[in-house]
Amino acid sequence: MPTPRVTSSPPPRANPLRYRTIPIIFGSITLFAFSSYCTYVYITLSRASASTVSSSPSEQTDVSTRYDTIARSFDTSVDWTEKVLRITKLRKKLLSQAHGDVLEVSIGTGRNLEYYNWGLTLRDGKGKEVGESKGKVKSFTAVDISEEMVNVAREKFLKLFPGKLGTRWIVGDASTEIPSPPMDTIERDGTLGKRKYDTVIQTMGLCSANDPVALLKNLGDCVKEDSGRILLLEHGRGNWKWLNGVLDKFAEGHAKEFGCWWNRDLEGIIKDSGLDIVDMYSVWWHGGTTWWIELKKPKAISENTEDQDIPPKLRNDEEAKKKWW
């Protein structure tokens, strides 16, 4: 009697995607973000006039008054693009570093307010002070050239954080003299006479300043030496020549609609300011048009005894090259 043949079932086939799930998900998210950015640029360009203009701020017209007109609708017009392009995430990361006496210039509609780690004085419903909340921000001064933008930002703060004291809202040009931190904070810190800020914040502000170099130099005068930091999230020229050509071509139309010149050379502006670069990099998924920048006030030449013969401008350039190239 023949022996029955025993056949075993074939081994299960391995899932070819088993070890590729994370790369596929990451790649899909990256592709979606980049596609969204391209869509945003296309939609914006389709509404703008095509007239190539210079990227130099000295040759660009002042469009800052546009913000008084669009202040009430500004948040609605940029909310979805900032979320899709992960600019909101960059804001959160930037604001997590703010501490002490904080100055935010180009406050706009206050899109950063909810991301600060507030530690301001509290008051009850009757206006009586009842202590201080725990947090890193001890005082807050906001500046913007647009009165309507400041009004929107202040209203937003009062809704988000009712009962908090220690904020000041100033309508003015941030490239001119800015008030020192509140006197009570200075006395509490025991640094009476220095009167400088611990942190200066600006997001998407260099694009609308008439003289961005003068603005940065003024911020350098406002921040503490050594420990103070100027934290910027900005947009300007990108990594590719063709993209910069597109930005130049449609810059005027975009400026008239949104009040900002999106084709400025941020690297050149930063270097011309004379401030020391702590960290600076462009966001690759935006084609290099969005920049994270951390600056500090340079030490006085007399204190740099080891290299006084090196001009400050050259020294800053060499430091930047070490960080970038």
Task: Give residue ranges: language-model regions.
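C-terminal alpha-helical "lid/dimerization" subdomain adjacent to the S-adenosyl-L-methionine
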Residues: W80-T81, L231-W292
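A short glycine-rich, Lys/Arg-flanked "PGG" loop and its adjoining helix->strand segment in the class I
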Residues: V213-G228
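A short SAM/SAH-binding and catalytic strip from SAM-dependent methyltransferases
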Residues: E187-T191, R195-P212
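Conserved SAM-binding loop
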Residues: A142, I201, L232
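N-terminal auxiliary segments of SAM/dcSAM-dependent transferases
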Residues: T7-V63
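Core SAM-dependent methyltransferase catalytic element
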Residues: V278-W325
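Class I SAM-dependent methyltransferase SAM/SAH-binding core
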Residues: G100-M183
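Conserved class I S-adenosyl-L-methionine
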Residues: C38-H99, R111-Y115, V246-D248
